[in-house]
A protein has these predicted regions:
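Hydrophobic alpha-helical segments
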Residues: 1-150
Length: 150
């Protein structure tokens, strides 16, 4: 039996795709699009999902993100390219994505609450959970982008 491909995943369980898409879209209405792009890309980097990295970097560029910031996103803590709000969100994304290998510290949460409302924190968390789910689906079924298939 051959591996289930991306289109088959969508056909075999459309409710899953719809649920993940709806959750991500709803949370993304509360959080600004440039930050959502950064989170999607950073989480995909952490999870090693080339398909998602390729897709979300292209989306970010299409929506006006600077290539310079995308180039250093994996080392965001070492640069001055990201705002305090972006840094807090990226740190939160890393903490939630890397569970259980690292504990959530009060420092990370305290930084987060200085930059985001409670509603925004819940929505950030939903974005992070959703992207992690997509990464695991894409990695599990070895999704390939058209550029990577060559």
């Amino acid at each position: 039996m051959s591996r289930i491909d991306r289109n088959d995943v969508y056909k075999l369980q459309p409710t899953l795709v719809t649920a993940l898409t709806n959750l991500g879209d709803a949370a993304g209405q509360v959080i600004e699009a440039p930050l959502v792009h950064l989170l999607h890309l950073r989480i995909s980097q952490l999870n090693g999902c080339a398909f998602c990295q390729h897709m979300h970097a292209a989306e970010a560029r299409r929506d006006g993100e600077q290539q310079q910031r995308l180039d250093v996103l994996a080392a965001w803590q070492e640069t001055g390219f990201f705002s305090a709000r972006e840094r807090a969100a990226l740190r939160w994304a890393e903490a939630l994505t890397l569970l259980p290998s690292q504990q959530l510290s009060d420092t990370v949460y305290n930084e987060l609450i200085t930059q985001f409302s409670q509603q925004e924190i819940v929505n950030l968390s939903a974005i992070i959970v959703t992207m992690n789910a997509w990464n695991r689906i894409a990695l599990g079924f070895q999704f390939q982008s058209s550029l990577m298939a060559d």
